[in-house]
Amino acid sequence: MKIAIGCDHIVTNEKMAVSDFLKSKGYEVLDFGTYDHTRTHYPIFGKKVGEAVVSGQADLGVCICGTGVGINNAVNKVPGVRSALVRDMTSALYAKEELNANVIGFGGKITGELLICDIIEAFIHAEYKPTEENKKLIAKIEHVETHNAHQADDNFFTEFLEKWDRGEYHD
């Protein structure tokens, strides 16, 4: 199984620990960054993870930022992604079994590393239960998706990053 993973600069260490855990369990990890602590932007990495999952390059995705809120919002903008921001086992299992979530999000500064790893392992092993009710819920979720032609542009974030480099945005 291939698992895509991405994070922002705030939780690079946590992402690397999760990546190492997944590799120790025999999973192939596709690491979409970031790879250091240089200030960066979580939407970039959420988008990359989401695209890898939707394209079939990865089977599942894991997104981590400080609280998990930002990167999870970003990955959920990729059409075809159903990501759940979780902090507990119950939410993660519900997301996979009932809503067929294909990405799971965490706040690396909110949820401990060992718990994150336990939740991910349970999420991987959980199976979607395709009941009529669950299918209808997923169809309703998919119905509100919007497709933005600009999302497919490889330079989607270029203007934003150039402005950042010029000092037009600040933390």
Curated annotation (Swiss-Prot):
Its EC number is 5.3.1.26. Pathway: Carbohydrate metabolism; D-galactose 6-phosphate degradation; D-tagatose 6-phosphate from D-galactose 6-phosphate: step 1/1. Keywords: Isomerase, Lactose metabolism. Belongs to the LacAB/RpiB family. This is Galactose-6-phosphate isomerase subunit LacB. SUPFAM superfamilies: Ribose/Galactose isomerase RpiB/AlsB. It catalyses: aldehydo-D-galactose 6-phosphate = keto-D-tagatose 6-phosphate. Heteromultimeric protein consisting of LacA and LacB. PANTHER family: DNA DAMAGE-REPAIR_TOLERATION PROTEIN DRT102, RIBOSE-5-PHOSPHATE ISOMERASE B. InterPro entries: LacB, RpiB_LacA_LacB, RpiB_LacA_LacB_sf. GO terms for biological process: D-allose catabolic process; galactose catabolic process; lactose catabolic process via tagatose-6-phosphate; pentose-phosphate shunt, non-oxidative branch. Pfam families: LacAB_rpiB (PF02502). One of its GO terms (molecular function) is galactose-6-phosphate isomerase activity. The keyword Isomerase applies. It comes from Streptococcus sanguinis (strain SK36). It comes from the Bacteria. It is an enzyme of class 5 (isomerase). The gene is lacB.
